[in-house]
Every structure is written in structure tokens, then in C-alpha cells.
UniProtKB/Swiss-Prot annotation:
Residues 270-295 are annotated as: Zinc finger-like. Belongs to the SEC23/SEC24 family. SEC24 subfamily. It is a peripheral membrane protein. This is Protein transport protein SEC24. Component of the coat protein complex II (COPII) which promotes the formation of transport vesicles from the endoplasmic reticulum (ER). The coat has two main functions, the physical deformation of the endoplasmic reticulum membrane into vesicles and the selection of cargo molecules. Residues 1-52 are annotated as: Disordered. Keywords: Cytoplasm, Cytoplasmic vesicle, Endoplasmic reticulum, ER-Golgi transport, Golgi apparatus, Membrane, Metal-binding, Protein transport, Transport, Zinc. One of its GO terms (molecular function) is SNARE binding. It comes from Podospora anserina. Zn(2+) binds at C270, C273, C292, C295. The COPII coat is composed of at least 5 proteins: the SEC23/24 complex, the SEC13/31 complex, and the protein SAR1. Golgi apparatus membrane; Peripheral membrane protein; Cytoplasmic side. GO terms for cellular component: COPII vesicle coat; endoplasmic reticulum exit site; endoplasmic reticulum membrane; Golgi membrane.
Amino acid sequence: MSGASNDGYGQYPPQQPGDHQQQPPYPDQAYDNAAPVAPGHAADHGRKKKRQYAASAFDVGVGGNVVAGGQPIPGAAPYGAPAAVPAYGGYPAQPEVQPAAYGAQPAQPYGQPAAVSGYQAPDPYYPSAGAVPAPGGVAGLTAGFQGMNLGAGAPGGIPQQQPQQLPPQARAGPLNQLYPTDLLNQPFNVSELDLPPPPIILPPNASVTPSPDANCLPKYVRSTLNAVPTTHSLLKKSKLPFSLVIQPYAALHDLDDPVPVVQDQVISRCRRCRSYINPFVTFLDHGHRWRCNMCNLTNDVPQAFDWDAAAQKSVDRWQRHELNHAVVEFVAPQEYMVRPPQPLVYLFLFDVSYASVSSGLLATAARTIEASLDRIPNADRRTRLGFMAVDSSLHYFSVPKDTDENGETSMLVVSDLDEPFLPVPGELLVPLTESRRSIENFLTKLPKMFEHNQDNGSCMGSALRAGDKLISPLGGKLVVLSASLPNVGHGKLTMREDKKLLGTSKEGSLLQTAATFYKSFAVECSKNQVSIDMFLFSSQYQDVASLSNLPRYTGGQTWFYPGWNAGRAEDAIKFASEFRDYLSSEIGLEAVLRVRATTGLRMSTFYGNFFTRSSDLCAFPAFPRDQCYVVEVAIDENLTKDVVCMQTAVLHTTCNGERRIRVMTLALPTTTNLADVYASADQAAITTYYTHKAVERALGSGLDSARDLLQKTITDLLQTFKKELAGGSMGGGLQFPSNLRGLPALFLGLMKHVGLRKSAQIPSDLRSAALCLLSTLPVPLLMQYIYPRLYSLHDMPDNAGIPDPETSQIVLPPPLNLSSEKFVPYGLYLIDDGQTQFLWVGREAVPQLLVDVFDVADRTQLQVGKATLKELDNDFNERVRAVIQKSRDHKSKGVGSIIVPHLYIVREDGEPSLKLWAQTLLVEDRADQGLSYVQWMGSLREKVSS
């Protein structure tokens, strides 16, 4: 199946050679008949024969994938035959003319390109989809343009538009149909989390061009509702949230995710609401004017809109990027600049206290920066770097230019922490291009300068103030690398961890900032266009709760490495790899984000790491590429249009000194029908919204309040659905739409997450760091962080762990639900939440498996804990390593991230604390005061029926 991402991520195994049946039309069927070759009789296909690690002691083929359908039970129907189990949504497979359940893919032979995930054509869902358009479709569109004299000889030389077909999102047909499912009898399957959101079905000719890219892809902007209620009262009645999840960048580098760029600086905007021209406007008056799709005002089309100034010739309007693509980037003219574009500035604040030096942090950080100098964006040769060292004093470094023959880096020490002055400010920020050799020499010597430092003090707060003062004339990034609690000077913090408070109602106080300095200083930095990123490494209490305020209000991020020590190769490699990618990432500077919408809609609340400068303007001194943002939408007036639009614009300076505006336009149909609203709700976007809401609640009112919010929300949704759409009667079941079937499991995962769960064992630093991730991770990574991935490796299908012949991407085994019921004692499993990976070795794993994967014959010799899997010369080891690596691959998930998860080897009969930690990721099991999935569903049924 060439499905959502065409790369094996969350895919089912492709068809084996020799099979000619079509792909089953339902994911569950594909899932239940995934491997045509019986265990132990795998066809060779020119590769080494697959080993059966359980065969020596147990029935062949019994294991995790059997539960999921990875290996068929002997005597099962051949691949492609109708499945015995109900199809997705709990309904029998229907004839082709009937609409299939939400999420079903069209039946098609393997190798045939599938519809792109996201807003694909609704062909598989509706009988009317793809039918010849009725009069008034394409013909009407063309006739309309002819009536406007937009033929080849029209004034201005605008050629006549001749669309070949309707765009995929503008087919005729009803909105998504509602498919109720019984959550108790047809439980959630983890593979459903890989399905695209319900399709956005717009009326014919909603966009001005027939481009397939006219509407925004969900990887950039996704709505919790893909059909919008026309009234506030209907939205309120639904109990569903209406919000946008916005991730303007899908990769760390433009090359990995290019978007069309409008270079000619002709930017047409609405005079009243300031929206940018987009595929959903309409043209009037022979194409000389356009009507805004947000506020309905008629605007003049700029004279240069149909003219190429560089080539001095007229151009085809209908080829312009902004009329064909929902996501475009405009090169901004002079009026979009308050001052000349700022250069990229990094000021590194090194903790050089005893804790930092002894853990190897200083040496590793200096070495990584030195090795990454070529990767720091510097295309315009204006990038500047500065360096400060911090213990109980401030150490400034003046790095000379390479042309200074006798130039030596000089260190200046300042001990006055209350009003730290800047010695020779002009020499502290040096151009990378002009001082490259001197910077390398300095970074080589830096660890030696402090190798015998016994100072335990850290005046990081004072250092931050000095750093802000130093770079605020230009703006830029303060990069903090700290292994100790700031204990002297401004923002001094004390050890406040109190184990007696953990797990109590007072625990929330430990998650709030201990000093007002950190928020007020962060807001000041934001005004100065200074962003702060924190890399925190302490093995002791570090007050992540206070320090994380600095990135939270300045568009930065907090990275936490508990118990980090460079003496462990895995620790050193993880940080060096992540820091290297961090330094090479392209970022936006001096950025602001604003969302505009159709009249009647208003952006009411904003969530994410930024400072809200006015009611609807989010300010980012630096705009990262690995975070997402949530905006709540209010319906202030009744909506009278069939389609509403929301347009996100990010004005920023690129690393290369170019001012640009990235514009993302999302169009959604409206409805007066509650069933349409539920049938078009996006469970991943809803979960993301409530994650941000729960984090806000945890930081403001405490963890109990956050968990109560989630419990109440899911109960309200189930009760509303029962009362309004299930006829008030459910019998003994629990009805919910099939497209929201994963919501209870996701909410349970969130309530049991390390950031939110009730426990007296979780240090507050660990919780605070988890809350930072919960409120910033892009949707695919957040879903995995809340509901981790579980793969059975000992019996994975033959094609797993090797490249797909068509896409060349490694194929992953089918994911399993997070329950210990999926485990067998001789199994090998990978549990991966995107931040940490656990390789679980069963207590009865056979020697051959241990030899092939770990190169040890006896399980007791297996080293548990942080590890790097050895490269061994056998087929199975190679496949296991490929699966581990592929599971870490962010690009295939359509996101940018620097995270490289640690790999822990866990023996079922080994280190108890490590085993318990891995088991906390099994969301559907009962653990640490948390309900199992079965208990959770039972309690929800009681609440809903009471």
C-alpha cells in the first residue's frame, strides 16, 4: 500500500511477489491478513532465510504480530480474501457503490500511486465522487471567465483559464458520513493513528484554479474540525473544540521541504483585513479586481500581477504560485522591514563550574561547536558568534579576526554581578567568516582554561542579562549550556525539590517558576529580539520549571539531559548529534505570526512558545522549525458562507538576510448538521489542543486539575454523542464515531504520561521537561510521545526492516497496541515514544536470537541500560537495527526535529527499575495509580450511562 507517507512509516507490509489480488479496501483487513507466507516456510526471494526464534521451544508463529495479524494463523484465508472480522468502524465491508467507513483507502493494485494523504479526493468515500460535473461545474467556471472577457485577447493580456478538471478538494458530493462504532466491541487499533484526518470536502469550484495544492496540507495547518458549525450554539452543543494546529515548517532545512517562493515582490493584500491573495478569492471586473474571501471587500489587482518585470513580458496569471498553492512564501519588499534584516547571531553561555567541567559538558560542547562551524547557516557571510563562560563570575572572550597577525583571544573577568558591564562590546561578537581560524583555536583551548576549576557557583541569571545587553542591538540567540542551578547573582534559585510534596495536591507549586525574574526577563528579551535556548544537564536538581520560562516566552526550547556524563559514549554521542543538528538548522529571525479568518471567526487564544504582543500577534525573536502552535477559534457571528478560510502568515527574516512572509491558507466547508461536525473531527488535532490546554492547566492550577479537564472532556464528548447522535440509547455499548475511536486511548495516554500522571516518584525537573515537550512537539511526534510505538521484532514480517522496492524506505513491522497482552516470554520488542527507545528482551528469549542481535549466547551476559546495538554480520541484526533507525526517522513523519532517542536494553528478568520505566509506556496496562484501558473504558461507560 503506497499510503500516507509512501515511506513505510506505519505501513502494512506490501504485497508479496506472486500475489495479484487488489489491496483490501479496509485497513483492518490489510492488518489481519498482512503476511501471505506461513511462519517457518518463508519464501527465499534471494535473501537469507528468516530465522524462527521461537520455534525451538514454542508453537511456531505465536507472538505479538499474531495478535495484530502480522503472521496468519495456519488455515487462515489467503491474503486479499474477505476478512472474517468486521471492517473498520465495525461494519461489514459494503459493495463498492456504498460509501466506505472513514479512513478506508481505495482498492487498487500494488504499485499504483495512491492518493496523497491529507486532503485527498473523496473518491473512496462517496458514490458521487469523481462523477462528471453537472452544468455549472467546470463548464460554468469557464463560461464565467469568458463572460468576463478573460480570453487571450482580454485587456491586460490575461489568458483564458482552461482547467482540465476539478481540483480534488472540490468534487461534488455530501460531507463526510458519520460511522458510529462501539468502543467496547470494536476497540481502537493503534494503526488508526496513521490514518489521515477526515478529508476536507469543498463545494465545486471553491478555488479559483484547479490546482491539487490549493488547500493547505495537514502537515502545515490542521483543524480540529474539517466541517465548521455555522453558529456558536452548534459548536457549543457539540462540546468539540474548534482550533488550528499550526506547524509552518515541516523540516529543519528548506531543501528537505521546499515551498513555492514568489520572488517578484508583487504582494496583493486586502485593503481592509490585510489578508493575502490566495486560491480562494474571486476575480471581478474583467479580472482587474478581486474579492477578498475573508471580509468580502473588493480590491484592485496590482498592475504588475500579470507582468514579469525581469523579462519585460506579460505572464499567465493562472500560473502564479499564490493562486495555485495554499502554502507560499513571498519575498518581502522594503515596507515589511523596520530596520535592515538582522544577521544571525549566536551567543554561547558556557557553564564552567565544577559540575560542568567534571561531567565533560564544557569539552563536549566546545568540540561540537568547533566541528559544526561549517554547518551554521552563513550563506550571506554575516553570521556572528560570541562566547561567555559562567561560574560565580562572568568571563568574556574577545576573539580576534584571522587577519590580526598577533591576535590572541583575550579573557576578561567581571565579578560585579549586580550591574555587569560590557568590556569592549564591539569585540565580543565576531563575524564567523572573518574569525573562523581564531574561533577554532579558542574552542580548542577553552576546556583547558577551566579544567581545574573547583568553583561550584553559577551566576547564569546575571550572565543572561549581560548577554541580552550585548546582543540586543542586533537581536539573536542566547544558547545556554548549563550543568548547575543558578545560585548567585540575578535570578538566584535554591534547591526546592521536596519529596513529601510529590504526588500531592501541592506538587503543582514545584512546576511553577520560583523567581519572577525568569518571566519578566524573558518578556524583555522578546522585545529586544533575543531568543533563549536552554540545554540543561544537571545530575542534581536544576529547577527546570523556572529556567524553562526563558525559552517559553522567546520562541526557544528547553532540552533536558538528566544525569548526563560525557564518560558514557551514548550520552556524548546523543548530545553532540542533537547540538550539531540544532546549530545547522535554519531559523527565522524577528518573526511575527498572525492568523486571519473569514468574517464571523476570531482567533481567541494562542498556545506555544512565544510572546503574545497584541490580541492577535505572536512575537518570535527567533522562529524554530521543530515546534507547533495551537490557536483557538471563536465563532462570533453566524457563518453564512459555504466555505470559511483561515490564513496564517509568518513574517520573518531568513538566515540569509532576506525578509519573507510564509502564508498558509486553509479552506473548510461549513455545516448546520451536528453529525457532519462529528464525522469531520480530527482526533490527532483534538488531542493536540487538549494537550496544550492540560499543560496550561497543570502549570496554573496543578496536575489534578489538568487530569480532571481531560476526564471531563472525554466524558462530555461521549455523553453528547450518545444524547444527540446515538438516539440516547447505547445498550451495553459505548458509541463514538469511527474517526474518533482513538480519542479515549490518547486521552488515557496523556493522563498517564510522565508529565501529568499521578505519582510520588517523578522528580519535578523530569515533569517540567516533559511539559515543555508536550506543549511544543509537532503532531506526529506528540501522538507518539502520548501513545508510543510498540513493534514485535522476533516475528516481524519478511519485508520488515528492509527497503521497500518502490520507495526505498525501510518498512516497519505493524505497530501493536500498548498492552503486555501482546508480549510473549521469548519475544523481542521495540517500545519507542520518540524521546526514548526500549529494546525489550523476554525472559525466555532463545540463544540464537541473543547471538544474532546482541552477540551473547547467555541472557545473563546481556548488558542492560543505555546501549548502542552492535553491527553484526547477519541478516536479522541488520533488520533490527534498520527498524530502530527508521523508527527514529523524523523526515518520514513530515516533521523537523533534532532529537536522537536513547536506546535502552531491557531484560524482562533484569534491572527492576529499568523494567518498570519501560512498562510505564504500556498505556493500556494498569500501573502507578493509573487505570488499564479496559478499566478506563468501563469507567467511561458508567459515567456516560449514569
